[in-house]
Amino acid sequence: MEIDFFNSQCQSVSNKKRFGLCDEQDDKEPAYLDERNGAKWIAVVENDELKEVHFIAIDYCIEIWRDDDPTKMEKRCDGMLWYETSIIFVELKDRVSKKDKNAWVEDGEKQLKCTIAYFEKTEQSDKFTEKRVYIANKAHPTFKESQLQRMKNFKQETGYTLRIENRIKIPSY
């Protein structure tokens, strides 16, 4: 059965110049768009042209059941932004890994790849020409280590551009 990523109760819209994406990390609630409380923002969306940008929570909102075990839920990313013909899948992190400094990146990458794989099986994916993903971590707003090879591999495997940062720019064309 095809998953409808756009028929979600967990959808909000903003045309503000700056707004944030939030996720209360330990509760079982969906991520959400916030226009007021910057202290809670894990990712900051910069929307200089005031475009109408939609956010749809995926984790804890859209059910994606595993193919190999239909009684278990698949790992999903936190949500997606879309506007015009662009789509951006987002994984929000707010933690530092003490043991492995890349663990949160690897974890986020797996969640994004899994969600994208299901999205690409839908006809809905055909209407988007620009496809990006972000792994945003409030504890690491800019990632120090070069991830160029990881980003190149991600693009080759999925067709999506990967960014590891917590500033999401809505470009002007």
What kind of feature is each model-predicted range?
Residues 59-67, 73-76, 82, 124, ...:
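Electrostatic, structured charged patches in enzyme active sites and in nucleic-acid/phosphate-binding
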Residues 95-99, 140-143:
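Short acidic, S/G/P-rich loop/turn micro-motifs used as interaction or catalytic elements
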Residues 51, 97-104:
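Intrinsically disordered, low-complexity coil segments
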Residues 2-10, 132-173:
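Domain-level recognition of nuclease-like catalytic cores that cleave nucleotide substrates
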Residues 101-139:
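Catalytic cores of nucleic-acid endonucleases
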Residues 1-71:
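Basic, amphipathic N-terminal segments that precede the first structured/catalytic domain
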Residues 79-81, 86-97:
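Conserved catalytic cores of phosphodiester-cleaving nucleases, focusing on short active-site segments
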